[in-house]
Regions:
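Phosphate-backbone binding interfaces of nucleic-acid-interacting proteins
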Residues: 1-211, 345, 364, 368, ...
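Conserved mixed alpha/beta core segments that line enzyme active sites in large multi-domain catalysts
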Residues: 49-80, 151, 253, 260, ...
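A carboxyl-terminal module marker
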Residues: 2, 27, 444-447, 467, ...
Length: 806
């Protein structure tokens, strides 16, 4: 694999030399076998400078030669004999000075020497473009821009690209490093470990914007196992032509031959990010894109003009009339981009590695795309790479984005979970590495540390690290980055067999438990065994789903619980009967269910509150718990977990007399409300009980693990109040959402501080008093700016909600 040093430095800003970088890459396991110099013009035009022809006289002994004096930036001009018919005094020309090495068309070198031509000394050569490798013309010398200064290096004038290219002997398991970005990611980890503070720079795709939606091509993936993720977008109005010099130089440096600007961009992104892409001529696509297999024996002609016979398991990219491309391996002749192409469908996908490997082997094909798909690419950058390529195509080929990104991604590809035991690290490596160092190394490799204990770490491994799925793999990563040279080898070597402890994700649970403890909650741990009769208390629980014990100790302990509610109500009842009626309880626990296809376990977090909010005190008047108190606790937990993209929905469970559900992407995260009196009566409870049930399994899947913080604003915030007369059916949430949509940038907070329903109001109306906090983080707001925002909010409320000011 070839890696350009200049390209690498786009992702890692460093002043390290190529030698230092090469050594570190080798230490990290990315063995640099050769470092080659690359120059966009062979020889780099070293020794060639701009010359100013001062005089040009006919050679005294040769009709076709001229004797010139040329200023090449030295103290004295030099004499050069030239045979070109177009040389003349006053010109600025390229001059190859004494000792310069030039190359002919076949690549053979020749050196410029001082000599005599027909008795006249010549101290260099005025060059034609073919002599410099800038073209094929030999009609005459090159005449340069008159504004150039004598002595200016030609490499500067002609913008010769100089680079150093690492030839890396990449092992098959390191699919994550098969790109410049992946190599830079490893390099960052190694540099951080060596005390060099660097950041990994990711190219931005923030300016990806659809110009018009005039060419949408739908996608149908018939086998999501073979194509777990597929994205596409259309670009119209492009011009297929030669790529700009910078793009050609990038590709040439790593040994690729530029084709045209569209193909070159797909190759560029492939080697930049490791994501294979394919561009189809959109005009040649009939109907929609269909990803499927075709019958055994189907004929298909690929880009190399070879007719191939397809296997029934070959995954194909087709349209409604037939095949277009062998998925992840090779394009088809009829659908490829040509000089006449004006619109394209750009594909970015994640294909099954085993399927691609078998297809490539069957057809004897080994392409850059199949090479990466076979080893496993990063499933999380499919859309990002598509946007990156689309932006580059717009830059080098013009055109407009004419569709939204079409994506088929039915089931998210999950990351790997590994539990790392510190003692096992020591046993394998033979030397104790500080725990903080281990954590820093793992974080630098984009491995998330989910939980920390004295004995080890709970880790989440990115899906693109297909080679790191076990504890021993993690230890290898630690050792690789820590440095083999930093390990002291003893004379005696010990070998042990490591155990695999179960994976735990207690860190998040402990954080939330601590938060609830600080809010006055007590943690409870109820028995998972309960009575089968509880399933009859709710229609949402089914008796046929009960997991029953074969030999229970009693009928009250005969069934694995389907809900945490009833064991919680048992605890509430127990405490009330002992004169402890002000309660805040929580429990992390599992529920158990039997279905036709087997058994399932689901982890939940339950909250129960009942009685008074606080203990009786002369400073705090007695106030009972209510739904809004519970809602505050729930929202606080979600905020602590960094879950903010939530919405409310009607509660589905029939255990509540009143309640609501909080959803994330249409999946229910939490159900909460007041428990029905009929259920409370079964437990002998006469006071209201509020209950919240968190789907903890789902929460663990969606939390990001890191919460971003921002500095305290330097500029003051401003509060403005509105008293709105609204319909009884209007909710605070609808006002909140509408306000946020109306003023996204400067509206920081909204608070409902008074509700009035009663006399002097029209029938069916109520009054809400709301405060609006407005702030600009970059400057102090003026009264006119604030008034404009408040006027916009007022008009929106009047238009959308029929509200009026009181």
């Amino acid at each position: 694999m070839k890696i350009s040093y200049n390209w690498l430095k786009q992702f890692i800003k460093t002043d390290w030399t190529s030698e230092q970088t090469s050594e570190l890459l080798t230490d990290l396991g990315l063995e640099v076998e050769v470092v080659e110099k690359y120059q966009s013009i062979k020889g780099g035009l070293e020794g060639v400078v701009v010359g100013h022809v001062l005089t040009c006289e006919k050679h005294p002994d040769a009709d076709r030669l001229k004797v010139t004096t040329v200023n090449i930036g030295l103290e004295q001009p030099v004499q050069i004999v030239c045979g070109a018919s177009n040389v003349a005094a006053g010109q600025k020309v390229p001059v190859a000075t004494i000792g310069t090495v030039l190359y002919d068309k076949e690549g053979a070198e020749f050196t410029i020497k001082k000599g005599k031509i027909r008795g006249q000394e010549s101290h260099g050569m005025i060059c034609a473009e073919d002599e410099l490798g800038l073209g094929t013309s030999h009609e005459g010398i090159m005449v340069l821009d008159d504004a150039l200064e004598p002595g200016t290096p030609a490499s500067v004038v002609f913008k010769v690209a100089n680079d150093e290219v690492f030839e890396i002997g990449l092992t098959p398991n390191r699919a994550d490093a098969m790109s410049h970005y992946g190599t830079a990611r490893d390099l960052r980890a190694g540099m951080l470990q060596r005390g060099v503070n660097v950041e990994l720079i990711t190219p931005s795709v923030s300016n990806f914007r659809v110009d018009m939606r005039t060419l949408k091509i739908d996608v149908n993936v018939e086998d999501s196992h073979l194509a777990p993720r597929y994205c596409g977008v259309t670009i119209s109005g492009i011009t297929v032509k030669e790529s700009p010099a910078w793009l050609q130089d990038r590709l040439k440096a790593i040994g690729l031959t530029p084709k045209n600007n569209i193909v070159d961009v797909t190759n560029y992104v492939l080697h930049e990010l490791g994501q294979p892409l394919h561009a189809f001529d959109a005009a040649k696509i009939n109907g929609k894109i269909i990803v499927k297999t075709l019958p055994e024996g189907t004929k298909f002609t690929t880009l190399d003009d070879v007719e191939r016979t397809l296997h029934k398991e070959d995954l194909m990219i087709c349209d409604e009339k037939g095949p277009l491309c062998i998925a992840g391996v090779f394009g088809g002749k009829k659908s490829g981009v040509s000089e006449g192409t004006t619109s394209i469908f750009l594909e970015s996908a994640y294909f099954d590695a085993v399927s691609i490997r078998k297809t490539a082997k069957r057809h004897g094909l080994n392409t850059d795309a199949s090479f990466r798909f076979e080893r496993g690419i990063d499933p999380t950058i499919t859309e990002y790479a598509l946007k990156r390529a689309a932006i580059l195509i717009l830059e080098v080929a013009g055109g407009k984005l004419t569709s939204d990104v079409v994506e088929v991604y039915p089931k998210k590809i999950e990351d790997f979970s590994v539990l790392l035991n510190f003692s096992h690290v020591y046993k394998i490596i033979g030397q104790e590495i500080p725990k903080d160092t281990i954590k820093k190394i793992l974080v630098s490799l984009d491995i998330k540390v989910n939980s920390v204990s004295d004995s080890g770490l709970g880790l989440t491994i990115p899906a693109y690290r297909v080679d790191v799925q076990r504890e021993i793999d993690v230890i290898e990563e630690i050792l690789r980055v820590y440095g083999y040279n930093n390990i002291n080898f003893s004379k005696k070597f010990n070998a042990t067999v490591a155990n695999s402890p179960r994976t735990e994700d207690y860190k998040v649970q402990n954080v939330i438990a601590s938060q609830l403890n600080s809010q006055g909650f007590h943690e409870m741990m109820a028995n998972s065994l309960t009575t089968a009769a509880y399933a009859k208390l709710s229609a949402s629980l089914k008796e046929e789903h009960n997991v029953t014990m074969l030999n229970p100790l009693s009928s009250d302990l005969s069934t694995m619980r389907q809900s945490l509610l009833f064991s919680g109500l048992e605890a509430i009842s127990y405490n009330i009967n002992r004169k402890n009626s002000d309660l805040k309880l929580f429990e992390f626990g599992k529920t158990y269910h039997k279905y036709l296809n087997g058994f399932e376990e689901h982890k939940h977090l339950s909250l129960l509150i009942s009685g008074n909010r606080n203990k009786e005190s002369w400073t705090n008047p007695q106030k009972t718990t209510d739904f809004f108190l519970m809602k505050g606790y729930v929202k606080g937990i979600l905020a602590r977990l960094g879950i903010d993209k939530i919405s409310n929905a009607p509660v589905q469970s029939d255990i509540f007399s009143e309640g609501t559900a909080i959803c994330y992407n249409n999946d229910t995260l939490v159900e909460m409300g007041v428990i029905k009196k009929s259920i409370l009566k079964h437990f002998g409870i006469k006071q209201e009980v509020y209950y919240a049930d968190f789907n903890w399994d789902l929460i663990l899947k969606i939390i990001t693990g890191k919460i971003k913080y921002s500095e305290i604003p330097k500029y003051p915030e401003v509060r403005r109040d509105l008293a709105l007369l609204i319909d009884q059916s209007t909710t605070y949430e609808s006002i909140f959402n509408l306000a946020k949509q109306t003023e996204k940038a400067l509206l920081k907070d909204i608070n409902l501080f008074d509700v009035y329903e009663g006399k002097n109001l029209p029938e069916g109306k109520k009054s809400y008093a709301l405060s609006f906090t407005i702030q600009d983080n970059t400057k102090t707001l003026t009264d006119s700016q604030i008034d404009k925002i408040m006027s916009k909010l007022q008009q929106t409320f009047e238009t959308e909600l029929g509200a009026s000011l009181r």
